[in-house]
Amino acid sequence: MWCVPSSCNYTEIQEALEIALDPLKVEGRVDLVVSVTQQSCRTLASDSTVFDLADWIYISILAIFALIIIASTSYDIAKQGHLRTLNRKDTKHVLLTSFSFYTNGKNLLRTDRHRDAIGCLDGLRYLSICWIIYGHTHYGEAMGVKMNLAEIPHMHHDWSTMLVLNGNICTDTFFLLSGILLAYTEMARRYKESNWRFDAIGLYVHRYLRLTPAYAMMIGFYATLFYKFGSGPHWNTWVGANRDYCRENWWTNLFYVNNYVNLPSMCMSQSWYLATDMQLVWLSPILLYPMLKFTRGFFFWLVFALALFFSVLLPFLITFFLGLSGTMLYYKEPTMVAEVYKKIYTRVYCRFGPYIIGLALGYVLYKTRSCVVKIHKLYVIGGWLIAAAAGLAVVFGPRAMYFEDHVYNRIEASFYAGFHRQLFVLAISWIIFCSVHGYGGPVGKFLSWRGWIPLSRLTYSAYLCHYVFLLSDSGLVRTTGMLTPMGIVRSYFGNLCLTMFLSAIWSLSFEMPFMTIDRTLISRRKQQSGLTTQPSQGKLFGSTDSGKDMYRSTEETSSTISQTYNDDIQGKSCDDSVYNSAGDISYHCEIHESENPQDIDSCRKTDEEQRRYNHIYVISSAEHPKDASGWSTPQVPKPCGHIDITLHENLDENLNKESRNQSEKENYSLDNTNTYLIREDSNEICPTDKGYNGTVINS
């Protein structure tokens, strides 16, 4: 960086530099091209702040939001003394407090977790965004003004730098989580609503309303005020260019087509992921419909297998016929990096593999959501070893491609391009599955740490905000520096802390309020349409209320406790579910005709706290009474294709209240025939008949 008189223009500076550096070119020691652009020249006049119409419009929008937030927070605080008489679920009250920093702040900092939540998703979500921010920070430092840039082509000699050079694989974790949560929430809705129908349009509208407000406000910030926050020789190159891109192409972002339309001038370069994820939601009914419609699952698994096959085939063929590298080899072949980015990296037809694996895993997790899955210890160890080997091979495998003596192999590149993303997310899927079913060990405990919960709630806003600080760092530089590991770590933690601070403000202002509004309006629409819903199935993402990978959505709950399974009577299994009074599934399992009914106990939750019931439920299904010695038949009664679960609120009237005790068993007679009696705090299901005394423990 040099200081010259302000009367000099950029062409004169370029001519002077060419004359000064010409001896180096003549002697052949340096082959260089001198280029000075008008944007790289800064003066006091050019740095003066000027606001145009777009700036004032955005400022006005911010002012309106600020007034709404102040009013909502004031109302919320004023009503705190009247909470006993105020219905917190009242639609009017919920909408009036949706922008309250008080309520939203409390919700953001909560660390309680629903008992059926998959806690490991909190850690996975936050650590993934940390990995992304680290990779982008390293990239920004390497692209900056450094004195030792000649060392960059040798980065791959250090194994640890592959976490940066191949760190783009981390985005597939979010595609996986998105598929998991979409499948799980739609499966829960399928069995929660008595007159369920697949509503693709509702899914699209919900997703759009869920993501767009915070996204649109960040696009507006890029296009207007961001440029006013600094200056420097590279400010126009980084921040100014993004301002221009966002003013020209904002509509491609809001329509979520920016990964196809005007890709080289994309507003917010990280936003390709949001477009790709939205497009995957648009395509998801291809798998979601057979998953939800055909309860036996055969057709779904057939469609899944075909989709998975094409997810490997398409990037394989594109890489093979275009002669591309297997991944983006950043500093080895810059032109090849651009081609891979345009033809494969940002294209939905090359990125849907992890997403459909997520859909399948979400389906499996829902089906086994309350079962005790027993896996032999050797299989568990083997699974962890294979998952670790696959994950490490995917991340560190391309290192050999960076060396100069590596000869390009079309088959090698095509195989890596086709398989590496699927292998990586399968390894992550194993971690999730094991953590859910008690085989996660220290990894599962670490990922399920409650400290991740508030941080994971900020993941989406952090993804939107983190580039603000990266672009600022690159644009403000006025002196050269050294590219060192410690310098990168220092920059990373600075960027991470600032990102989390800004993302908290962004989430409280533009994300959480619209999430509350969306949830409230959907719940009200369902009530008006007369939908009868089942009790909440337990939130897979309960701790973070996250419904979509790095995005959050909270499912509506209902006080209606009833459920009917209408499976094929000729089928070989049926689903039994037991609910507590809060409407949460206590356990769920498939009972096969050839199994002993006592094996139902093997499918229960092992945690005693998760088996406490406040009411007694009767499942109309049994056909054979039980004698004093045990079951009259070793088989489950065949007519288990139709099971009604009904809450008997007046069951206490049938009990002898004088002999009631919290810890003692009681006997009473039921007039119902062909029923199972579920006993509280016992894990037994007793078939009853007229005159048979069922046994109950009251809690």
Predicted regions and their residues:
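Helix-loop boundary elements of multi-pass alpha-helical membrane proteins
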Residues: 71-126, 184-213, 280-308, 360-389, ...
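Kinked, hydrophobic transmembrane alpha-helices enriched for aromatic residues
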Residues: 116-154, 161-183, 210-229, 255-258, ...
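Generic alpha-helical transmembrane segments of integral inner-membrane proteins
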Residues: 67-70, 74, 130, 216, ...
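Alpha-helical transmembrane segments of multi-pass integral membrane proteins
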Residues: 347-361, 381-512, 531-536, 543
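Exoplasmic/lumenal regions adjacent to the first transmembrane segment
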Residues: 1-123, 128, 135-171, 175, ...
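Hydrophobic alpha-helical transmembrane segments of integral membrane proteins
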Residues: 122, 165, 171-172, 176, ...
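Intrinsically disordered, low-complexity regions enriched in proline, serine, glycine
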Residues: 11-14, 142-143, 184-186, 214-220, ...
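Aromatic-enriched alpha-helical transmembrane segments of multi-pass intramembrane proteins
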Residues: 248-275, 282-425, 487, 497
